[in-house]
């Protein structure tokens, strides 16, 4: 009630922050005259001076005014660009670990240099994160002269980079790269077998460009490093033949069935579900095709994998459409980012869905994969000591940035007031009427000599729009995922007089559309242009620039609303940069996805009440409000999904931190002999407790089982029963001491044979391999648990609490298995001395082989049998090799090794 009054009296929080920072801006400006008087050498020497002052105890905050003044003066001398006062506020916002929302064309890249320079002085490294390789290279090479003038080094990380080059890039003061590459390198570092193999230093400070795209849009897709699994292509092909025989079950809103069928589709949640008739029908078809045994249920535990394949096939056919969610290019299914319209090479959908789409499109089906390491952007970026970001659209997601990442959003005032006109939406009854109105608007704008940008949500819509324009004989350029390699060229001239560009949501994000076209791109296209040619090109551009401004600037037309207001705002933001004139208009129809699913009833009733006729449009603030309300509803649902994903991944993340800390400590340790000795005692105690329960009577002891377990775990045969028969003074405690001594003595003999140094090195290698293999299997188990945990809700249990409880139990079992399996392997192997050169060559071969099998994805992967611990050329010879029958052992059956334990408690743990 009093909030508007208080806001009027004291200003909003954002306004108060701007006022606070303006005081610092005045101090920076006061340094300007002094900086102008310095020579280049004196200005460059300021960097060394700042580092020295930091070492003596000054803070970055204390250095900020003078450091910003130095960076501003260097920008003038090197780049010919002086930071505006509002850009100084943007730099302070980034330094304070906040998100700076700045409109298109306000110079975000230049703003970043202020905070990056200041924080690079600490010597701990700064990461500048972009959405793609093109922007990373462009920005790094653009700003490199400025940083190098100030005595700072700049590196760029990219995929398929030689390791030495990548390490040098991370060792630089400032490192540019994509969010994917930073995340994957973090995972690779935690798979390294030595400290020298690691790439990243401590995660100190990151500036994320297009922060909303990375921390919001990408948050739902985990980063996965995976290895290939077994081939199931025949199964996908068989399932693909069956799916078209299923029909959709359709009910009207009142519950009246209009079409009997086998499955239902929920467009809001993008889910497809088999009904009872569908289950029976699919079981019959699977039985007939020989995929399901006679009388078997699809819901039997051993058939759940088959059920997953059926659902993958259903989703591939009914929810994923070519040229909307994916395209087919060079025999591969390339996913399309719904937020940017760009293809995502290398990304694959999880749970067999990608393979099901390949089967649907009659392509070569690639093998499934198993997760080797994974994380999410949410958890990766929260590892940085300080995080900040820049974007043109963040305020609509301010609550999520604050609640998930602890980042406040600061709206930076524009250097020049916005002159763009944003017209109300026009809503039509049908899509055909909408497209006719769009073409009429295009013709009118082009007649005026204005450039026009038409934004579409999908490739399908952009190509439909292109076909309509061809029929009208209107010249245009198309920019979508199919033609992304021409993106920079098309966007460069999208602001030329009368230019017409059709673009999916990507709309050349990160590249400004300059009114009149881009004269620098014209110069770059010439070979060795003369000064006269450059001057002529610039003069011609100036005329075109003025012509476009006088005609009204860039006109943005949107063919539909996106689910997110932020994406709509990004499209609008292509026009009206730096105070330029411009306009935007959204054209909608009741047949659009968003309107049909979320907003149609209210708007449809309103249109009926007005008695609208075909071809007429409604333009009313109430309609625009109804649509924005629908968008807020979708945004809220998507936020809940991201938050839920984070809550589940937080459980895995705590475990990930423990395992990675254990791994890093192991890599840093020179001698892990004491750790192995502790493992040995703990494993022995657990083994004894299993067969000789504490404080039990001798009659309850399972001596034969204990002898078998010791032979299995420690590769030692001890006559325990004979000892007990011969020595009346041998009771539980003294027996423990005797067993520990025998096992330790046996291991010490191995140490004498191999040499202490060789065995210590070998212990570290084995522990690393066991830890990695079991962690890999644990990730797969956690995936399966996560995907089925929602069913606990039917038993009146809280799925989240159940997941936490069961994952904790699984993690405890993992830690015990790491100890037991490490001791088992070390006890069974025979170690020989190896030539250091041979050893180094072997380790390099193994690392290269592992790297060649890796895939880098953004989707969880199903399980795979663990790789053998010993490889050809390794220095191990396993004394006991598993001998298996053709029939697979059940998890509760006695283990094949003769230990007397159940398979799941013995070799089943590592297989």
From Swiss-Prot:
Entry binding sites for ATP: 87, 105-109, 512
Keyword entries, A-Z: ATP-binding, Cell inner membrane, Cell membrane, Cytoplasm, Membrane, Metal-binding, Nucleotide-binding, Protein transport, Translocase, Translocation, Transport, Zinc
Catalytic activity line of the entry: ATP + H2O + cellular proteinSide 1 = ADP + phosphate + cellular proteinSide 2
GO BP field: intracellular protein transmembrane transport; protein import; protein targeting; protein transport by the Sec complex
Annotated residues for binding of Zn(2+): 895, 897, 906-907
Entry's EC annotation: 7.4.2.8
Protein name: Protein translocase subunit SecA
UniProt organism field: Pseudomonas putida (strain W619)
Name of the coding gene: secA
């Amino acid at each position: 009630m009093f909030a508007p009054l208080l806001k009027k009296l004291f200003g909003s929080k954002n306004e108060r922050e701007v006022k606070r920072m303006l005081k610092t801006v005045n101090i920076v400006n006061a340094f300007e005259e002094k900086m102008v008087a310095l020579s280049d050498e004196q200005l460059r020497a300021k960097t060394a001076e700042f580092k020295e002052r930091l070492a003596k105890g000054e803070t970055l905050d204390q250095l900020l005014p003078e450091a910003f003044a130095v960076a501003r003066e260097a920008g003038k001398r090197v780049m010919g660009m002086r930071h505006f006062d509002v850009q100084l506020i943007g730099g302070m916002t980034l330094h304070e670990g906040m998100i700076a929302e700045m409109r298109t064309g306000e110079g975000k890249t230049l703003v970043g240099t202020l905070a990056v320079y200041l924080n690079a002085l600490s010597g701990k490294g700064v990461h500048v994160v972009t959405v793609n390789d093109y922007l990373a290279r462009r920005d790094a090479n653009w700003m490199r002269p400025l940083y190098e003038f100030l005595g700072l080094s700049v590196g760029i990380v990219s995929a398929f980079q030689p390791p030495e080059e990548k390490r040098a890039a991370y060792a630089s003061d400032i490192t540019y790269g994509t969010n994917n590459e930073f995340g994957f390198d973090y995972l690779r570092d935690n798979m390294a077998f030595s400290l020298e193999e690691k790439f990243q230093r401590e995660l100190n400070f990151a500036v994320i460009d297009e922060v909303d795209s990375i921390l919001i849009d990408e948050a739902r897709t985990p980063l996965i490093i995976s290895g290939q699994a077994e081939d199931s292509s025949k199964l996908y092909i068989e399932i693909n033949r069956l799916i078209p025989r299923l029909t959709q079950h359709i009910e009207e809103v009142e519950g009246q069935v209009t079409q009997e069928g086998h499955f239902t589709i929920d467009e809001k949640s993008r889910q497809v579900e088999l009904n009872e008739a569908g289950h029976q029908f699919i079981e019959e078809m699977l039985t007939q095709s020989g995929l399901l045994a006679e009388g078997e249920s699809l819901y039997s535990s051993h058939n759940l994998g088959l059920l997953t394949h059926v659902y993958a096939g259903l989703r591939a056919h009914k929810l994923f459409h070519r040229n909307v969610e994916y395209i087919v290019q060079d025999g591969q299914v390339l996913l399309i980012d719904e937020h940017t319209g760009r293809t995502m090479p290398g990304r694959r959908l999880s749970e067999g869905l990608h393979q099901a789409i390949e089967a649907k499109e009659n392509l070569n089906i690639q093998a499934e994969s198993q997760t080797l390491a994974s994380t999410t952007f949410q958890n990766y970026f929260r590892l940085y000591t300080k995080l900040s970001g820049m974007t043109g659209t963040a305020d609509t997601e301010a609550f999520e940035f604050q609640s998930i990442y602890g980042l406040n959003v600061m709206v930076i005032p524009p250097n020049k007031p916005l002159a763009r006109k944003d017209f109300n939406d026009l809503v039509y009854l049908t899509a055909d009427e909408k497209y006719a109105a769009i073409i009429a608007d295009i013709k009118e704008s082009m007649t005026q000599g204005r450039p026009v940008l038409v934004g579409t949500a999908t490739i399908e819509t952009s190509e439909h729009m292109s076909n309509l324009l061809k029929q009208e004989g209107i010249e245009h350029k198309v920019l979508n995922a199919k033609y992304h390699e021409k993106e920079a060229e098309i966007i460069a001239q999208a602001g030329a007089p009368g230019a017409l560009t059709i673009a999916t949501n990507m709309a050349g994000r990160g590249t400004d559309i300059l009114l009149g076209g881009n004269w620098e791109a014209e110069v770059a296209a010439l070979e060795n242009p003369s000064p006269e040619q450059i001057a002529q090109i610039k003069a011609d551009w100036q005329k075109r620039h003025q012509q476009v401004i006088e005609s009204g600037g860039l006109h943005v037309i949107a063919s539909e609303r996106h689910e997110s207001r932020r994406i709509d705002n990004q499209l609008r933001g292509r026009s009206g940069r730096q105070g330029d004139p411009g306009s935007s208009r959204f054209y909608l129809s009741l047949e659009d996805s968003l309107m049909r699913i979320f907003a149609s009833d209210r708007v449809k009733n309103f249109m009926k009440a007005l008695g609208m006729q075909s071809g007429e449009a409604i333009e009313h603030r109430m309609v625009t409000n109804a649509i924005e309300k629908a968008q807020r509803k979708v945004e809220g649902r998507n936020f809940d999904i991201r938050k839920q994903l984070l809550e589940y991944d937080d459980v895995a993340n705590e475990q990930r931190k423990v395992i990675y800390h254990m791994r890093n400590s192991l890599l840093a340790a020179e001698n892990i002999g004491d750790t192995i000795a502790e493992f040995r005692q703990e494993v022995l105690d657990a083994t004894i407790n299993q067969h000789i329960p504490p404080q039990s009577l001798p009659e309850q002891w399972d001596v034969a089982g204990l002898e078998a377990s010791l032979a299995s775990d420690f590769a030692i045969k001890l006559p325990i029963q004979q000892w007990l028969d011969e020595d009346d003074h041998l009771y539980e405690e003294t027996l423990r001491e005797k067993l520990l001594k025998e096992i330790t003595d046996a291991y010490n003999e191995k140490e004498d044979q191999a040499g202490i140094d060789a065995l210590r090195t070998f212990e570290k290698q084995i522990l690393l391999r066991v830890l990695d293999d079991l962690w890999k299997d644990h990730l797969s188990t956690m995936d399966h648990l996560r995907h089925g945990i929602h069913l606990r809700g039917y038993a009146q249990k809280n799925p989240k609490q159940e997941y936490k409880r069961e994952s904790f139990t699984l993690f405890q079992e993992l830690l015990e298995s790491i100890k037991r399996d490490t001791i088992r392997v070390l006890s069974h192997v025979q170690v020989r001395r190896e030539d250091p050169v041979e050893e180094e060559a072997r380790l390099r071969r193994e690392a290269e082989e592992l790297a060649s099998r890796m895939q880098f994805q953004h989707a969880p992967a199903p399980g795979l049998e663990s790789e053998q611990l010993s490889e050809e050329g390794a220095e191990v010879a396993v004394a006991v090799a598993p001998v298996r029958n053709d029939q697979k052992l059940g998890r509760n059956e006695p283990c094949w090794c003769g230990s007397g334990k159940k398979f799941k408690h013995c070799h089943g743990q590592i297989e």
